[in-house]
Amino acid sequence: MSVKASTRQSGSVIIIDLSGQIKLGEGTAVLRDAVKDLLGKGYKKILLNLGDVNYIDSITVGELISAFTSVRNQGGELKLLHLTKKVRTVLEITRLYTVFDVRDDEAEAIAAFN
């Protein structure tokens, strides 16, 4: 299953809804390009909705870190929303769960942006 991404806006927050398997190749490129495009358009508040992502690999973990760093370096914030059990487990094993601001409620996540 390939990865799909769509964007929507809630106030000043852009939500990227991702679904499928994010892994080396097309999947990581979709994630990278979506974040890069939004930063290029001046958006600084990005919420990655991973509720329909059923698989990530180590390359994807690297892409999440890269996206987080890129957004922060542009003076923005990146948060994660609706982690599936598999994605949450990967982030916990790699001890990155505490690096990201992870939310389970979309309204709460949007309100948490500065």
Report each predicted region and the residues it spans.
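Short, flexible active-site-adjacent loop segments at beta-strand->alpha-helix junctions, enriched
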Residues: 11, 20, 84, 106
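Short acidic-hydrophobic, aromatic-tinged amphipathic segments that line or gate anion-handling sites
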Residues: 101-105
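Short acidic/polar alpha-helix capping motifs at helix-coil junctions
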Residues: 1-2, 53-55, 106
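A short, charged, amphipathic alpha-helix used as a generic interaction element across diverse proteins
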Residues: 113-114
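Short beta-strand/loop segment at the start of cytosolic alpha/beta domains
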Residues: 1-17
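Amphipathic alpha-helical interaction surfaces in cytosolic regulatory modules
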Residues: 22-100
